[in-house]
Amino acid sequence: ISATPVTPNATESAIKLYSFLRENFGKKTISGMMTGDMSGYTMGADFKTHDDVKYTYTRTGKYPALVGLDFLFASGPKANESWNKEYTDKAISIAKGLWKAGGIPAFTWHWKDPLDKKDAFYIQSAANGGEYTDFDFSTGFKPGTTEWNTESAAYKGIVADIDHIADYFLELQKEGVAGIFRPLHEAGGKWFWWSINSGEQFAALYRLVYDRMVKVKGVKNMIWVYNPEGSTVTSWDPGSEYYDVLSIDIYNSANDHSSNASAFDKFKNASKSTKIIALSENGPIPDVNNMHTDEAVWSWWMPWYSTWSGTWPGQTKDGVWKSNMNDERIITLEDMPGWDKYTAIIKPDTSTTSIATMPRMAGTATTVGIFDMNGHYLGITTQGLPQGHYVVRRKIQGNIVNTVYFKK
């Protein structure tokens, strides 16, 4: 598993978050909870007052370390209506408060019709008689290829929506907040418009989301997730350089707390053990004892919400909730170290490393970070550090350069 996230020049916060996920993967599992209804949450209030977050505390006496948030109302023909905008603003408010408290925001995007013709993301066969979209993103390609036709209406609509969501991430980035982003989720499932075409076409769409956000908009604070159905894990893969985490959504029957080891092993093998593996949506939680017995220790789990009449968190037995949230192998919010205190463990990129003695440092405004020789992040200045060798990471004319200095 890579020591650094796939995003080039990731923010310090993103590096810390990725390092935390990597450090604990296979040893401990991060507890999560999805949010749904925002009507009971007051803008700017403590995220712990959200009904879905409170649910976990009421059942267990502990808060989840990871909280799921959705851009469900951030795009589509009604995105600019006050209620919809308020929903998204509340989600961003929760993300900020959660990060400040040492937690992890995890974003999903139920992406509505990019042409804004329908306020829907489901295709007709999955809409259960409700509103659906017939948007076909393949109309954004040049005929017979997966090369984008930048003059097409489909491409322009897709890019406009991507840019809009990217702006929310950039707002968080300015405040030092990082998060997890799971775009185009449940890839290969025949219910969302982004999965109606081929795996090759899906992969091109995923790469467009990543490239537009990271390389054009400058989003550097997200940990990226590829979330396919089990049958499409390899055939729809956008490329390992586009995601940090491989995840699956599994909804067992109520009170079924099995580890889902077969899915874990399938995804681990598909990634050749090079990716963090997560259970990004679930009903009942996998019992921690089962996970460790079966050697299927998910990076995190996240039951879907209890609000909006959601029944999923209630599908976990009371005793299992309590025993798991009080087990040292499950990470709750109370167990989180605090991002200001956490030291990232990364391996310096020696391909751009030069050797020099430590002079009086100039241009400190360009310094990205100081690391010890084992890759531990130490801060942005060598002041107060003892004599020895350090890796100084600097941004020079837009490029990141690592230099090994000896401080006398």
Language-model features, listed with the residues they occupy:
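Structural recognition of the beta-strand scaffold that forms the well-ordered cores
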Residues: 29-33, 64-71, 104-109, 179-183, ...
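C-terminal outer-membrane/trafficking sorting elements
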Residues: 351-408
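Solvent-exposed loop/turn segments at secondary-structure junctions
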Residues: 36-38, 72-75, 111-114, 185-189, ...
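Glycoside hydrolase catalytic-domain groove-lining segments
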Residues: 231-290, 313-350
